[in-house]
Amino acid sequence: MTPKELVLEAVAAIFLNFDPTAAEQLLASDFIQHNPGVPTGAAPILGFIPGLKDSGIVVDVHRVISEGDMVVLHTTYNNAQAFGAETLVGFDVFRVEDGKVAEHWDNLTPITAPNPSGHTQTDGPTDVTDLNKTADNKALVTDFVETILKNGDVDRITDFLSTERYIQHNSNIADGLDGLGAALAGMAEQGIEMVYTDVHF
């Protein structure tokens, strides 16, 4: 199996089929968990499965991005009280090693109403169509994070973001550079500052 196939099969075993036996075959025994609410190791995950089944949790996978041994899922968790809310939207990052899911990071947030431009946290394109541009796109996004978010060189923002069509999925921000600028100004007025210190590859 490819890393993508392996991760999707593991997610199905844990969240769709609630099958600890199948999940055990897909998780490394020394599975590393970065979610602070879940102990590390495969055993805690396997022990959690019956409770997930009883909770009625339903997981919808919207997007899958895979490169090398890393796989990212964009998901919605419904009936997710076990994770702290009725419905959560999440990004899950998995690392695969020796044919097993070996490591996991995630970021979960409650679902919200559409943003001022009518976009939700999960709508939009789901298929990657320009695979021939993967290296260029990765370099562009990495440069954006380094230049704008980390170093704060906001005068160069139009080097990275379209002035004609910039779609925003943040629940509180409207489309376009004007929407982004207004949101950042509002954050500044409230003393909220985004600080990026490291880019992890």
Could you say what each language-model-derived stretch is?
Residues M1-F201:
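C-terminal and inter-domain tail/linker signature
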